Amino acid sequence: MVKSTSKTSTKETVTKQPTEEKPIQEKEELALETSSSSSDEEDEKDEDEIEGLAASDDEQSGTHKIKRLNPKKQANEKKSKDKKTLEEYSGIIYVSRLPHGFHEKELSKYFAQFGDLKEVRLARNKKTGNSRHYGFLEFVNKEDAMIAQESMNNYLLMGHLLQVRVLPKGAKIEKLYKYKKRVLVEKGITKPVKQLKDNMKQKHEERIKKLAKSGIEFKW
């Protein structure tokens, strides 16, 4: 009878061993799954931190959307704006604060680097014909006038800060024709000497009478 009991106990132990191993294997598999899922989550978090694609950032970035720029559209808009500005202005520029000795020849040579010139006029004094230190230049193309204004305004030339402005559409420089340098012509004396002396005596007598009325005695 003793032998039978020992056999049965050994059988029970043999049969119980696989039941104990199964939960251990299941636990190990669960641990592996959790570790792999946690590692995947950590990798995703790292990627989000590097690329800046976290969920909180996505929610905040919804208010700040970046628009794609179309270079062709921008170029067309710029061209249309430039055309409008060119239509509003003429090809004439006003230049002031010119230094001494900077006349028509110097102006035409200096501003010819921006484009072809139609006309160059310098304002002059009516009597002396000296420069009044400002003038007008008319370009063939309006674009050249705009470039000349942008590059030469507030430009230091021979100790003078130039002031350059593009005149509006319809402006002309006809005004400066009356400031042309005039040639002084000496006129000869046509009156006789006796008549000139008589006129001088008459004026002198009138002056003495005026002085006498004011109480001043004058003899000549």
Swiss-Prot record:
Reported consequences of knocking out the gene: Essential gene. Abrupt growth arrest prior to substantial depletion of ribosomal subunits. Fails to synthesize the 25S and 5.8S rRNA components of the 60S ribosomal subunit, and exonucleolytic 5' processing of 5.8S rRNA is strongly inhibited. Arrests at cytokinesis and fails to assemble a contractile actin ring at the bud neck.
Chain segments carrying region Disordered: 1-82
Entries under InterPro entries matching the protein: Nop15_RRM, Nucleotide-bd_a/b_plait_sf, RBD_domain_sf, RRM_dom
GO terms, molecular function: ribosomal large subunit binding; RNA binding; rRNA binding
One GO-annotated biological process of the protein: ribosomal large subunit biogenesis
Pfam families the record matches: RRM_1
Subcellular location: Cytoplasm; Nucleus, Nucleolus
GO annotations of cellular component type: cytoplasm; nucleolus; nucleus; preribosome, large subunit precursor
RRM domain span: 91-169
Subunit structure: Component of the pre-66S ribosomal particle. Interacts with NOP7 and RRP1.
Extra information: Present with 4280 molecules/cell in log phase SD medium.
Record-given protein name: Ribosome biogenesis protein 15
Source organism: Saccharomyces cerevisiae (strain ATCC 204508 / S288c)
Organism lineage string: Eukaryota, Fungi, Dikarya, Ascomycota, Saccharomycotina
Name of the encoding gene: NOP15
